[in-house]
From Swiss-Prot:
Involved in pre-rRNA processing. The lineage of its organism: Eukaryota, Fungi, Dikarya, Ascomycota, Saccharomycotina. Residues 195-207, 214-227 have a biased composition (Acidic residues). It is found in: Nucleus. The keyword Transmembrane does not apply. This is Multiple RNA-binding domain-containing protein 1.
Length: 828
């Protein structure tokens, strides 16, 4: 965890004093952390404002937090000895309960015990056999009511109706209600009619037929007449007097519906509030309702993050949440005044179930020294979004334009990053040659397409040279990862100036840099803040500009490896500056026409460092090598921890990059055998991460180039003129179909490998007859018959493995792994 708990603080210490204590590090290199790594400081206080003498300190990473524990534990603040330990989250089962939670649980247990006691008493009461006498209270033989009851139940012919009339009248005389004049006001109101009395009798019969769980209510209903039977048992009371006692006075003008409702309420009150309770309290087996937070996340697939570090970056959250599923968007609002995060963010998942998994796993967890608070996010507001119904009412061309503009923001990869407007290319070449565009291409010439392709190749070479001088890593365009701050602006008309591009994009935010080559065919715009760049991309993509339409593309990451963005912190820039393409070709080397076949000089060289301590971090490795000349960046290779999601483990080795091969060799000699964190380092020059061109060049022993995506209209003569401009061709072959049409690819073989390399770099991305040429080195021809037979065997083995894989897939065994390369196949 990256959050520490500090106990036994002095009672006068506040947040500023606690931060000052943790910032007093004499040697950050040996301590393993720096004061800038502190992300949060909090002293816990009671409701009256007094300190509870403990607090929390957050750090940027787990490693720095562990180093701070070792450094500050059992240290002193003035004369008070403090205790420092790693803090636990609320979701940790080992966290002790607070006093308030313990009291709440104790009260809950008491309520549950009382409920259990009531249920037990009720069960014992229901198990005891009961008689009608017990229910009516007539089980006692000395009870005078029993005698009255037996006398009343005798056969009328045998009973002496005059026997006890006087005694009963005397006994019950206090209960007789004398009729007075005030009773006359009730004569105008009728009591319950026969129908209502019948309904009451039906309800009583239904209540008597209820199940065992309603026996208690039935008992109470039967006891009600016993309480009021003093008046009913008095033979001197007339039926009218008894009826008046049960009448309810009704207000004048009261509707009949209210009268019935009031009658129902009074009836339920007479039965102690349980007359209608059984129907409402009937237990129904219902499924437990789902957490509303989960329901909301399932609808939107969006999470709202709070309590974030103000210097946090979007990449931090992409790395944290990408382990749960594909991310559609990570939005980190930026304060335009400070250039820092506002303390909250939005994460949009493609699959809502992945968002639920991320919420359950990360809510309440510690991230960058702070407690991460996750809430369900509201759907993203898109005021310009049109649904299918609105699109149907628009013309087809407008529909396609809107859909293409909506998909542009989601596009992560383009096949041709250095695409240029063909008209702008021809204008640029004509201007550089001092002629008109119409004079550059003869419409009557048969090789006009070849001339146009050569002109484009020339402009591409100039653009590459310009970007190389500006510090742009050309090989980064082959990377799939995109940087939202970088926008490639293409397809604008010739004559567009750099101030015009800057003015157009500066409306959406502060710009860091705008680069446009002298050819004026492409531009690179870099924003300071990601949200501003996204807004500009969404508004300007496929927007009409002058006489053309703007094509925008998100630029690659690490476009400027040796330059940091102003909005980034130094430590983060060092991580972003890691270049994974050592031994890469510079633009000047690519355009070199020398006859020497030696490999081009490298722009930077990496040193492979192994036998690292698993606790050694990239910061510690950087501190060990940064004093050497030519040092660029150091990185310890990490891998995800399978046991702890979101954490990484060191692989025991790393790489240190230097600006030149000479500096790397000097560092190897100086640091080989150096002891770091108790481990003796072993160094050697690394050749990792070569770009695609260098890798293909090493494989190309022969000087043959495979040309893909060749237009079907292109002839062998066109290929010879186009590729012959960059060297001496040995052979050119354009395979054809049975009807003499081109098959869409060709082969061009040069006299030397250097000429093939020159043509490969110059024509990569060039268009011929509207098609972008895709070039790669072809496999060298077999030097003898045995080598040719081996290649044929490998091809046949691969085809057989593919057929076997297809058969197993049809048979339901598609999950079995098959060696499609034929490395383990038996020889023929």
């Amino acid at each position: 965890m990256s959050r520490l708990i500090v106990k036994n603080l002095p009672p006068y210490l506040d947040e500023a004093g606690l931060k000052k204590h943790f910032s007093t590090v004499k040697d950050p290199k040996s301590a393993g952390f720096a004061p800038s790594d502190i992300t949060d400081v909090k002293v816990v206080r009671a409701r009256d404002g007094k300190t509870r003498r403990f607090g929390f300190v957050g750090f940027r990473s787990d490693e720095t937090a562990e180093a701070a524990v070792k450094y500050f534990d059992t240290s002193f603040i003035n004369s008070t000895k403090i205790s420092v330990a790693v803090a636990m989250t609320f979701t940790d089962p080992n966290v002790p309960l607070s006093s308030r939670e313990r009291k709440r649980q104790a009260a809950q247990r008491a309520r549950e015990d009382a409920e259990d006691d009531r249920e037990a008493k009720k069960a014992r009461y229901l198990e005891k056999p009961m008689t009608i006498d017990d229910i009516n209270g007539l089980g006692n033989a000395s009870d005078p009511r029993l005698a009255d009851y037996l006398d009343a139940m005798q056969v009328r012919s045998n009973a002496k109706t005059w026997a006890n009339n006087d005694a009963g009248a005397v006994a019950n005389e206090p209960q007789v209600i004398q009729s007075t004049a005030s009773d006359d006001e009730y004569d105008e109101f009728t009591g319950k009619g026969d129908d209502e009395i019948d309904e009451d009798e039906d309800e009583e019969e239904e209540s008597e037929n209820k199940k065992d769980d309603d026996n208690e209510e039935a008992e109470e209903d039967e006891e009600d007449p016993v309480i009021e039977d003093g008046l009913a048992a008095d033979p001197g009371v007339s039926d009218m007097d008894w009826l008046r006692q049960r009448q309810t006075r009704i207000k004048e003008g009261e509707p009949e519906e209210d009268r019935e409702n009031r009658h129902t309420e009074s009836k339920s009150e007479g039965k102690k509030g349980k007359g209608n309770a059984p129907k409402a309290a009937t237990p129904v087996d219902e499924e437990p309702s789902e957490d509303p937070t989960i329901v909301s996340i399932r609808k939107t697939g969006r999470l709202f993050l709070r309590n974030l570090l103000y210097t946090a970056k979007e990449e931090d959250f992409r790395q944290l949440f990408s382990q749960y599923g594909e991310l559609e968007e990570v939005h980190l609002p930026i304060n335009t005044k400070t250039g820092q995060c506002k303390g909250f963010a939005h994460v949009q998942f493609e699959d809502p179930e992945n968002a639920i998994a991320a919420y359950e796993a990360q809510d309440g967890k510690i991230f960058q020294g702070r407690l991460l608070h996750i809430l369900p996010g509201k759907p993203k507001k898109d005021y310009n979004r049109l649904d299918e119904h609105d699109l149907k009412n628009l013309p087809l061309k407008k529909q396609q334009e809107l859909k293409r503009k909506a998909e542009a923001a989601k596009q992560q990869f383009s096949w041709n990053s250095l695409y240029m407007n063909q008209d702008a290319v021809m204008e640029s070449v004509a201007k550089s040659m001092g002629i008109k565009k119409s004079e550059l291409i003869d419409p009557d010439s048969s090789d006009a397409a070849v001339k146009q392709a050569l002109a484009e190749a020339t402009v591409i070479g100039d653009v590459k040279s310009y970007f190389e001088k500006m510090g742009v890593d050309l090989a980064s365009f082959d990377n799939k990862d995109r940087d939202d701050r970088v926008i490639l602006v293409k397809n604008f008309p010739f004559g567009t100036t750099q101030p015009e591009i800057a003015e157009m994009f500066s409306e959406y935010g502060d710009l860091y840099k705008v680069m446009m080559p002298p050819a004026g065919t492409i531009a690179i715009v870099i924003f300071k803040h990601i949200p501003d760049a996204r807004a500009a991309f969404a508004k300007l993509a496929f927007r009409r500009f002058k006489t053309s339409i703007l094509y925008l593309e998100k630029g690659p990451k690490n476009l400027l490896p040796n330059e940091k963005m102003e909005s980034d912190e130094v430590e983060h820039v060092k991580q972003d500056k890691i270049v994974t393409i050592e031994d890469k070709l510079s633009a000047s080397d690519v355009m070199d026409t020398g006859s020497n076949d030696e490999r081009p000089a490298t722009a930077s060289t990496s040193v492979f460092v192994k036998n690292l301590n698993f606790k050694t971090t990239s910061r510690v490795l950087t501190d060990a090598f940064k004093a050497l000349d030519g040092f660029l960046v150091a990185q310890v290779k990490m891998k995800p921890d399978s046991k702890n999601k979101g954490k990484f483990l060191s692989m025991g080795f790393g790489f240190v990059e230097f600006s030149s091969k000479e500096a790397a060799e000097i560092a190897q000699k100086a640091m080989d055998g150096h002891v770091l964190d108790g481990h003796k380092l072993q160094l050697k020059i690394s050749n990792r991460g070569q770009d695609e061109e260098t890798t293909e060049t090493k494989k190309a022993i022969d000087s043959k180039i495979l040309i893909k995506n060749l237009p079907f209209e292109a002839t062998k003569k066109d290929v010879q003129k186009l590729f012959g401009a960059f060297g001496s061709l040995k052979t050119v072959r354009v395979p054809k179909k049975f009807n003499s049409e081109s098959r869409g690819f060709a082969f061009a073989e040069y006299v030397s490998a250097k000429e093939a390399e020159h043509a490969m770099s110059a024509l990569q991305g060039t268009h011929l007859l509207g098609r972008r040429l895709v070039l790669q080195y072809a496999q060298a021809d077999a030097s003898n018959a045995e080598e040719e037979i081996e290649r044929m065997q490998a091809t046949v083995s691969k085809q057989a493995a593919q057929r076997s894989f297809a058969d197993m897939k049809l048979a339901g065994e598609g999950k079995r792994r098959v060696d499609l390369e034929g490395e383990d196949e038996e020889e023929f």
